[in-house]
């Protein structure tokens, strides 16, 4: 079974199981190299309160061929991930969806969530993403990978502002591409600056070592070169 039919088959089983647990299927990644990895991402349903027991953790599921990644910073509990992992693993085995040996991973999308549909990008307009195009963009010969800010989403078209320009003498300009031309994309999480300001409004900085005053009649001595 090729990647796309397999992904659709796994999604058809995972979607109602996730819904019964009060969570939503976010997307599925299939890594086919050696032993196949089925990576299932689940998220809290829109409008649902964030559970009190969310935490980052990793737990191995009990069924053979099933591994769980229970990182849950987005509102999905570890218990929900574990239960879905067990139920989905058993269902895939009963239905014989995957013929070869595989590893099943169930987790939340995390802070740098991947995007599987263009509708998932809409709430993150203005944020920074990393995306890879299926083919190089005409204005960027040979380049497919970009770090950029999301400008807007219109229908099936994504517009983004790259952090660099094609030529050094130009400023970055927005690029619009069809979502079908995006091979993969994920959010870039920017951690806030926690540097404490010093008196006078300046942030703390390490002072550069100053050369010692020479002894009378001697040459200057700089400890930083020893």
UniProtKB/Swiss-Prot annotation:
InterPro entries: Ribosome_maturation_RimP, RimP_C, RimP_C_sf, RimP_N, RimP_N_sf. It is found in: Cytoplasm. It comes from the Bacteria. The keyword Cytoplasm applies. Residues 204-215 have a biased composition (Basic residues). Disulfide bonds: none annotated. Pfam families: RimP_N (PF02576). One of its GO terms (cellular component) is cytosol. Keywords: Cytoplasm, Ribosome biogenesis. One of its GO terms (biological process) is translation. Residues 190-226 are annotated as: Disordered. Required for maturation of 30S ribosomal subunits. Belongs to the RimP family. This is Ribosome maturation factor RimP. It comes from Nitratidesulfovibrio vulgaris (strain DSM 19637 / Miyazaki F).
């Amino acid at each position: 079974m090729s990647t796309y039919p397999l992904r659709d088959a796994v999604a058809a089983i995972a979607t109602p199981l996730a819904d019964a647990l009060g969570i939503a299927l976010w997307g599925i990644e299939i890594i086919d190299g050696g032993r196949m990895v089925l990576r299932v991402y689940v998220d809290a349903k829109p409008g649902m309160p964030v559970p009190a027991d969310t935490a980052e953790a990793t737990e191995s599921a009990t069924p053979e061929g099933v591994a769980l990644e229970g990182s849950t910073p987005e509102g999905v509990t570890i218990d929900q991930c574990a239960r879905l992992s067990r139920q989905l693993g058993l269902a895939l085995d009963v239905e014989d969806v995957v013929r070869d040996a595989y590893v099943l991973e169930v987790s939340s999308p995390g802070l740098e969530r991947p995007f599987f549909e263009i509708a998932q990008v809409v709430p993150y307009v203005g944020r920074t993403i990393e995306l890879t195009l299926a083919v190089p963009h005409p204005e960027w010969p040979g380049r497919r990978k970009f770090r950029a800010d999301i400008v807007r989403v219109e229908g099936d078209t994504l517009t983004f502002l790259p952090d660099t320009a094609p030529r050094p003498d130009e400023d970055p300009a927005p690029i619009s591409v069809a979502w079908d031309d995006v091979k993969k994309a994920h959010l870039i999480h920017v951690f806030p600056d926690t540097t404490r300001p010093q008196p006078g409004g300046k942030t703390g900085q390490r002072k550069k070592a100053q050369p010692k005053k020479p002894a009378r009649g001697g040459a200057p001595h700089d400890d930083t070169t020893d």
